[in-house]
Amino acid sequence: MRYVYTVINSPVGRLKLVASEKGLAAVTWENDDPRRVRLGPLERDPTHHVLKAAEMELKAYFGGKLKKFTVPLDFNGTDFQKSVWAALLTIPFGETRSYGEIARQIGRPDASRAVGAANGRNPIAIIAPCHRVLGAGGKLTGFAGGLEAKDHLLTLEGRDPRLGLTGQGSRKEQNQSRWVLQQT
C-alpha cells in the first residue's frame, strides 16, 4: 500500500499526517516513537486530497469551529485495537471516558489494561480522540503527545482536566459545580 504524508503546525506542536487512498492512516507527533505507528514507506505529498481535508479539519478544530471530524479514516491494527479505536470515535467532544468504560463498551470488561495499550497505539491522534480517555479516578495518564498536549486538547474542548471524569458539561457548568461543592 502507498502512504503519503505532510507535516503541519498546530497549537500542540508539529503533526505528521499520513494517508492512504482509503483515508487518513495516522496523525503522529513531532517527537513520536517511530515504532508506535508502523505503516511502511512514506512519500511526501502535501496536495493529497485526504491530507488536505485532514489539515482543514484540524485547523477548524484548533480554531474552535469543529467538534466532529468527517475525514475518512484507514485504521491499521489488530481486531482488538480497531474495536478500541472505534470506541474512541463515539466519545463526544467535551466528554471523557475511563479505560474501564471503554473496556465495558467493547464487551471486554476485564480488559482495561489492554484498552490502555491499544489507546497508546492509536495511530490517528486527536481525530480518534484518545486524549478523551482518562485513568482510574479521572487522572491524566500517558499520552504519545505528552500530558501537556492532552491537557491542552481537553481544555480546548471545554473540559477542565482537573475535574477528571466528573462534571461533563461546559467549563461554565463545571465551574458552577465546583462552586456548589465548595459552598456545601
Language-model regions, residue ranges each:
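Short glycine/serine-rich loop segments
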Residues: D110-H152
